[in-house]
Amino acid sequence: MKQVSNIEELNDQLLVRRQKMTTILENGQDPFGSRFERTHLSTEVKEQFADQTKEQLEENLQEVIIAGRIMTKRGKGKAGFAHIQDLGGQIQIYVRQDHVGEEAYELFKQADLGDIVGIRGNVFRTQVGELSVKAEEFTFLTKALRPMPEKFHGLQDVEQRYRQRYLDLMTNEDSKLTFIARSKIIRAIRNYLDNAGYLEVETPMLHTIAGGAAARPFITHHNALDMELYMRIAIELHLKRLIVGGLEKVYEIGRVFRNEGISTRHNPEFTMIELYEAYADYQDIMSLTENLIAHVAQEVLGTTTVQYGEDEINLAVGWKRVHMVDAVKEATGVDFWQPMTKEQAQALAKEHGVEVKDVHEVGHIINEFFEQKIEETLVQPTFVYGHPVEISPLAKKNPEDERFTDRFELFIVRREHANAFTELNDPIDQRQRFEAQLAEKAAGNDEAHEMDNDFIEALEYGMPPTGGLGIGIDRLIMLLTNSPSIRDVLLFPTMRHITK
């Protein structure tokens, strides 16, 4: 019965608001007004007049023009107060009939929470000292036909926050600040790389081969060409082609799509930055990564110390670096530096409670040890390098031990934030790696890499030694804004379809 009464109450509110809209029209006013030129945002009013006393403002009248959404409203008779909200925040307005006129005051009296209004008036301080605007002219700009969410606490239903982000932004200041920070973080990354001489480029999102990562793609069909295409799962292979072509320092910030599960860390479409630098290696990229992230934190937050949940994270340059085999040995006592067979590695996995598949080779098993035993312990920024060649089909082998590659992953607060390596530029080795991946796919690994003959042909023209990097932008923003879920940093995350 409660749900029925709530629906009836909502329907009553919708009806009342539409009746008010009709009244506005009948009085010759437009309930969905036109252009309105402001002189100030609410924050600009507060900053500009912060130092002026009540007496100073009364002596020297300061006119401003502001506009925003009514968030609170009180008063009776011939005067009333309201708080309106704009991009900068909220500010109080004071509306009197003898200042704005009877017709405009009636519009103010009939206005509902959520309506959008414009004010021309003078800045003053109330008896309690609150900086406010006394209206000399009141303009009705937009009638809200639906009531806002709960008045003081914003949206209480987390899923509704994600589905109707506009309501979340309307009522949740923290959410709005998160997305403003997101924009600033991406801009800071761009500025850093542009100043370092990197060229921003754009490459296709529709690929003929799903390559560049171990992931399941979204598949679509091009009608005119009658061919299957894949939404890109990585940006990598096209950027490497540009390195072959002579663009020596390139990056792209763009959407990537993976047809996989949804969690607090994963969304089917997400934003990545990938960059490549000719004549560099993974050590150079490691230094670039920590300098870039430390710079972005300082630029956007004003500090390199950030709070994430219960953890205080130090992003200042000087991050820990550890080989994957050493990390496994330190945590479990298992020494994968020693040569061993697949069967011996599987026996060690069973002994230590590490789940592996029959198709896993020694390199896969080393990685499973790391993911199941060590990853959850890495809170402070840590570069884990030296990944096995079996799980790194696009990375260059380490010249001192070809079982491993010159690759690293960055872990902060128990999750991967970046993946990088000295790029494999030997086309013969690359073909062999792709062939090994095809064998894995035939054995049941549906995330194994496809053969990409066009990319191999590009390598045959000669790619200089190159370092490459991929950073998950959304996870970085989660870290820098202390957001527990990836959905908190995506304006419109992917949600299960519901029938209304």
Curated annotation (Swiss-Prot):
The gene is lysS. It comes from the Bacteria. PROSITE patterns: AA_TRNA_LIGASE_II. Its EC number is 6.1.1.6. Keywords: Aminoacyl-tRNA synthetase, ATP-binding, Cytoplasm, Ligase, Magnesium, Metal-binding, Nucleotide-binding, Protein biosynthesis. The keyword Acyltransferase does not apply. This is Lysine--tRNA ligase. Belongs to the class-II aminoacyl-tRNA synthetase family.
